[in-house]
UniProtKB/Swiss-Prot annotation:
Principal place of residence: nucleus
Domain of life assignment: Eukaryota
Mutagenesis or variant effect for residue 388 to W: In NPHS12; doesnt affect nuclear envelope localization; impairs nuclear pore complex assembly; doesn't abrogate interaction with NUP205; doesn't affect SMAD4 interaction; doesn't affect IPO7 interaction; impairs SMAD4 protein import into nucleus; impairs SMAD4 protein signal transduction
Gene: NUP93
Name under which the protein is recorded: Nuclear pore complex protein Nup93
Modification type Phosphoserine: residues: 52, 66, 72, 75, 80, 430, 767
Disulfide bonds: none
Keyword Nucleotide-binding carried by entry: no
Pfam families in alphabetical order: Nic96
Keywords: Disease variant, Membrane, mRNA transport, Nuclear pore complex, Nucleus, Phosphoprotein, Protein transport, Translocation, Transport
Any one of the GO BP annotations: nuclear envelope organization
Disorder: Nephrotic syndrome 12: A form of nephrotic syndrome, a renal disease clinically characterized by severe proteinuria, resulting in complications such as hypoalbuminemia, hyperlipidemia and edema. Kidney biopsies show non-specific histologic changes such as focal segmental glomerulosclerosis and diffuse mesangial proliferation. Some affected individuals have an inherited steroid-resistant form and progress to end-stage renal failure. NPHS12 inheritance is autosomal recessive.
GO cellular component: centrosome; cytosol; membrane; nuclear envelope; nuclear membrane; nuclear periphery; nuclear pore
């Protein structure tokens, strides 16, 4: 601003001040500098807001104007819009205003219908969402249940286990997830299944699995010796496992087998002890248990213990000799000691002879009562622990006394208590003289439990305790929880399963170890299917052949829906490992099927292949499912899936290694084979498949620039009309096409119109002088092309299928350009 402007402004200010001072009625307002600054800022911001709005309007006009939009027209339209009339409140009407009443009722009905529909839609959406969450939660629960290997509190025990290594940590080289012990077991399972599948005599699975113990330590070897001993029982044929396991005869046989194992183990222990201390043992005399026990006592009891009674035999306490001969399972040797000391033992010789000669090592009720009475009167507080122990075993009395001075090891305690177990309920025995197998099982599993046996340091000891008391399921479930011992637990379960000794859970959702209503209190059930699936999960993706061998054990098992578990596991295995050709076989070029691993297990592979194909289809793996259905000779499903696969890629440009190229080659291979072999599917599906192949050929020619050949193909297909007379016919025929064809109609119409437009431009670019055709022929061709373009427009408008607005616009645009 120049000097004159400032001078003029100063003059106006002085004049204004003079006029203000001249008015004496008005009070003077004095402002300080801060107030003046604030007032100036307010004025400035007001001016800037107006300026910025104008600037924004200018920028908007420039931006939208560059795109061909009229900003003033848009502003007017926006200002004219009003949301007030969308849902205006209903106005009160007079009683005689019929028109107003009807209008309000109509509006009310519309609003009510809209509100009801809204509520119903939201309710349905909420219900679907809730159901979806419930289904998803059920799946998550199943995964959690499959992860938790134990039951009860043990499943939530996250304490660090410092267990020793029982198997080699070094696995075989390569891609296998199996270590050397697991691979050795898998090899034995393969041998076993081969015999079964080929119809040979069923081999002894215990012996096969026990041979693996040679690769491992002594604990594993002893375990399999025990399993072999305990499973060597005579079962009633054609009887389920629960009836067999609950029968008195079988339970008595289990006790006899357990005692035999414990006695043989102790005899082996005495042999090792004696031969390890030959100088101290002074072994000699006639070979046999008696001399072995004498030598063993030279080591165990080098000096006489105070309190021992009834003298000695050859320098050793009588009752110690009798006890250890019985502990080694040799009653004849014990009888030899009794005969030598019969004068000191009173009636015991008679009682022992009856005990030794009885079938079940049981005295007659009269003799038993007599012995028990003698024990209560004279021996309960006797100072000779061996004498008390022998009387408690023969008379099965005073079961509450653990005889800890003699039975100081767990195996000794087991042997003593199993000798006292009784099965007959004569009603005459007092509670302190009666111990049933069920009571003993409950005592070991529930009263003592894992904490009593220090399972982290001695897992095999607790397994032995449970197994020798016929609690097979609890023993297997316990061992399975130990990561390093899991493979042994699984194969023990397989042995029990094959021998019909395993009690299985009735449902797959049950915990690994469970008790079902109606079962005896002492019995537990093992979820065998889950056990096997948890074990194979480790290696099924890397070793599908081995996993298949284990799944074969489930061939007679059903899930809750009645589906065969072998089929289900195989289908999941194939989908997981993607080893379709190796497991299910492969289709050769001539249409014959190359057998897969599954052929070893069944002669009729179609149900299995169809099942796997169905699972693949449900998972959206249509290409794999089509190949599997082709393998199973299910032509209808093959072409149905191929139609779904081909439909999206029909209009695409073919390129090497592309999805379309792969699917096209696959479809052509199927088509050639089906035609050569005369294979046909459902007529509707069949015609759709071959029409899609023709459309692929059409688009390949079109994209390659061979428009005349492409036009010949579309003309022969008669998919779209090319003259007005055939429009009605093509529209009627369109209703019979499948969705796979209809979805490609827009692209077919555009490609056909492009061909007509290209031919039209080519015709227009031909001058009469350079053309060999007469002018009349060119004009006729010109008219024909325009007519064909109009026919396509008419057809696009008449078909009962909604094409995109962009398609219609492009069709009309090209048709207009031709006119």
């Amino acid at each position: 601003m120049d000097t004159e402007g400032f001078g003029e402004l100063l003059q106006q200010a002085e004049q204004l001040a003079a006029e203000t001072e001249g008015i004496s009625e008005l009070p003077h307002v004095e402002r300080n500098l801060q107030e003046i600054q604030q007032a100036g800022e307010r004025l400035r911001s007001r001016t800037l807001t107006r300026t910025s709005q104008e600037t924004a309007d200018v920028k908007a006009s420039v931006l939208l104007g560059s795109r061909g939009l009229d900003i003033s027209h848009i502003s007017q339209r926006l200002e004219s819009l009003s949301a007030a009339t969308t849902f205006e409140p209903l106005e009160p009407v007079k009683d005689t205003d019929i028109q107003g009443f009807l209008k309000n009722e109509k509006d009310n009905a519309l609003l009510s219908a809209i509100e009801e529909s809204r509520k119903r839609t939201f309710g349905m959406a909420e219900e679907y969402h809730r159901e979806s969450m419930l289904v998803e939660w059920e799946q998550v629960k199943q995964r959690i249940l499959h992860t938790l290997l134990a039951s009860g509190e043990d499943a939530l025990d996250f304490t660090q286990e410092s267990e020793p290594s029982y198997i080699s940590d070094v696995g075989p080289p390569g891609r296998s997830s199996l270590d050397n012990i697991e691979m050795a077991y898998a090899r034995q399972i393969y041998i076993y299944n081969e015999k079964i599948v080929n119809g040979h005599l069923q081999p002894n699975l215990v012996d096969l699995c026990a041979s693996v113990a040679e690769l491992d330590d002594k604990s594993i070897s002893d375990m399999w010796t025990m399993v072999k001993q305990m499973t060597d029982v005579l079962l009633t044929p054609a009887t389920d496992a629960l009836k067999n396991r609950s029968s008195v005869e079988v339970r008595m046989e289990f006790v006899r087998q357990a005692l035999a194992y414990l006695e043989q183990s102790y005899k082996n222990y005495t042999l090792v002890t004696v031969f390890g201390n030959l100088h101290q043992a002074q072994l000699g005399g006639v070979p046999g248990t008696y001399q072995l026990v004498r030598s063993f006592l030279n080591i165990k009891l080098p000096a006489p213990l105070p309190g021992l009674q009834d003298g000695e035999v050859e320098g050793h306490p009588v009752w110690a000799l009798i006890y250890y001969c019985m502990r080694c399972g040799d009653l004849l040797a014990a009888s030899q000691v009794v005969n030598r000391a019969q004068h000191q033992l009173g009636e015991f010789k008679t009682w022992f002879q009856e005990y030794m000669n009885s079938k079940d090592r049981r005295l007659s009720p009269a003799t038993e009562n007599k012995l028990r009475l003698h024990y209560r009167r004279a021996l309960r507080n006797n100072t000779d622990p061996y004498k008390r122990a022998v009387y408690c075993i023969i008379g099965r009395c005073d079961v509450t006394d653990n005889q800890s001075e003699v039975a100081d090891k767990t195996e000794d305690y087991l042997w003593l208590k199993l000798n006292q177990v009784c099965f007959d309920d004569d009603g005459t025995s007092s509670p302190q003289d009666r111990l049933t197998l069920s009571q003993f099982q409950k005592q070991l599993l529930e009263d003592y439990g894992e904490s009593h046996f220090t399972v982290n340091q001695q897992p095999f000891l607790y397994f032995q305790v449970l197994f020798l008391t016929a609690q097979f399921e609890a023993a297997v479930a316990f061992l399975f929880r130990m990561e390093r011992l899991r493979c042994h637990a699984v194969h023990v379960a397989l042995v029990l399963f094959e021998l019909k000794l395993l009690l299985k859970s009735s449902g797959q959702s049950a915990q690994l170890l469970s008790h079902e209503p109606g079962d005896p209190p002492c019995l537990r059930r093992l979820n065998f299917v889950r056990l096997l699936m948890l074990y194979t999960r480790k290696f099924e993706s890397t070793d599908p052949r081995e996993a298949l061998q284990y799944f074969y054990f489930l061939r007679d098992e059903k899930d809750s829906q009645g589906e065969n578990m072998f089929l289900r596991c195989v289908s999941e295995l194939v989908i997981e490992s993607r080893e379709f050709d190796m497991i299910l076989g492969k289709l050769e070029n001539d249409g014959s099927r190359k057998p897969g691993v599954i052929d070893k297990f069944t002669s009729d592979t179609k149900p299995i292949i169809n099942k796997v194909a169905s699972v693949a289809e449900n998972k959206g793996l249509f290409e794999e499912a089509a190949k599997l259905y082709d393998l199973a000779k299910n032509a209808d499903k093959v072409l149905e899936l191929m139609n779904k696969l081909l439909s999206p890629v029909v209009p695409q440009i073919s390129a090497p290694q592309s999805n379309k190229e792969r699917l096209k080659n696959m479809a052509l291979s199927i088509a050639e084979r089906y035609r050569a072999q005369g294979i046909s599917a459902n007529k509707f599906v069949d015609s759709t498949f071959y029409l899609l192949l023709d459309l692929i050929t059409f688009f390949d020619e079109y994209h390659s620039g061979h428009i005349d050949r492409a036009f010949d193909i579309i003309e022969r297909l008669k998919l779209v009309p090319l003259n007005q007379e055939s429009v009605e016919e093509r529209v009627a025929a369109f209703r019979n096409f499948s969705d796979e064809i209809r979805h490609n109609l827009s692209e077919v119409l555009l490609a056909t119109m492009n061909i007509l437009f290209t031919q039209f431009k080519r015709l227009k670019g031909t001058s009469p002088s350079s053309s060999s055709r007469p002018q009349r022929v060119i004009e006729d061709r010109d008219s024909q092309l325009r007519s064909q373009a109009r026919t396509l427009i008419t057809f696009a408008g008449m078909i009962p299928y909604r094409t995109s607005g962009d398609t219609n616009a492009r069709l009309v645009q090209m048709e207009v350009l031709m006119n």
